[in-house]
Amino acid sequence: MLAKRIIPCLDVRDGRVVKGINFEGLRDAGSILEQARFYNNEMADELVFLDISASIESRRTTLEEVLKVSGEVFIPLTVGGGISSVERARDAFLHGADKVSVNTAAVNDPVLISRIAERFGSQAVVVAIDVKKVNGEYIVHTHSGKTPTQYEALEWAHRVQELGAGEILLTSMDRDGTQEGYDNEILKRISTSVHIPVIASGGAGNLEHLYEGFTKGHADAALAASIFHFRTYSIREAKEYLRDKGIAVRL
């Protein structure tokens, strides 16, 4: 059985780590470098760096910060926010990213997924899908959750897989920052219908939520921010809890 991954996420804005609720009401969550070092030493399996205002402001990811983080961590680093072209993906890789995460740009130009995958390999392409329930349907949103699209979540997940995505980062906007648990309904629906790994995101508030993301949502990895940034739990605590409940993790 493949080990399940625990992935902390650094949502970055104006040079600081931030965290909000339902993609709004951001509060400061510390220094980028301090958090990155902490997670590297804490046995995180990977680290995600998301410049959350890059797509809204139509600019590239803050590559200087990416370079600093990549010099401090020795775990796979995924970089997202403002990755709107093959050239910007290349720049992220040159600054130390192991994977890039595309979201808004992929919806606007789906072939971008294929172009990045052909150049750098599918394993380096994560497609972030932000979903919100609208009239009973899970609708994909872009621009940090501000813009609804015409895509239903499952339909888009299948499309990005066909285009060459190596992984899906699925975030429930309704659950984001609420600490009420992942939306395991849509998580299971997508995880069981695609053959690429799916990362659960949005809503982890305790260790049981991580467990449920794996058992009820069938996720391959669990991403969390609040519970780790504010030291409610450590990565080691999370992994030991999961191991004791029969989930394969790296310790």
Swiss-Prot record:
Pfam families, A to Z: His_biosynth
Broadest EC class assigned to this enzyme: lyase
Entry's Gene Ontology cellular component terms: cytoplasm
Entries under InterPro entries matching the protein: Aldolase_TIM, His_biosynth, HisF, IGPS_HisA/HisF, RibuloseP-bd_barrel
Active site: D11, D130
EC number(s) per entry: 4.3.2.10
GO MF term (any one): imidazoleglycerol-phosphate synthase activity
This protein's pathway: Amino-acid biosynthesis; L-histidine biosynthesis; L-histidine from 5-phospho-alpha-D-ribose 1-diphosphate: step 5/9
GO biological process: L-histidine biosynthetic process
Catalytic activity: 5-[(5-phospho-1-deoxy-D-ribulos-1-ylimino)methylamino]-1-(5-phospho-beta-D-ribosyl)imidazole-4-carboxamide + L-glutamine = D-erythro-1-(imidazol-4-yl)glycerol 3-phosphate + 5-amino-1-(5-phospho-beta-D-ribosyl)imidazole-4-carboxamide + L-glutamate + H(+)
Keyword set includes Chaperone: no
The keyword Amino-acid biosynthesis belongs to this UniProt entry's keyword annotation: yes
Annotated CDD domains: HisF
Keywords tagged on the record: Amino-acid biosynthesis, Cytoplasm, Histidine biosynthesis, Lyase
HAMAP family: HisF (MF_01013)
Function: IGPS catalyzes the conversion of PRFAR and glutamine to IGP, AICAR and glutamate. The HisF subunit catalyzes the cyclization activity that produces IGP and AICAR from PRFAR using the ammonia provided by the HisH subunit.
Family according to the record: Belongs to the HisA/HisF family.
NCBIfam families documented for this protein: hisF
Protein name as catalogued: Imidazole glycerol phosphate synthase subunit HisF
Name of the gene encoding the protein in the UniProt record: hisF
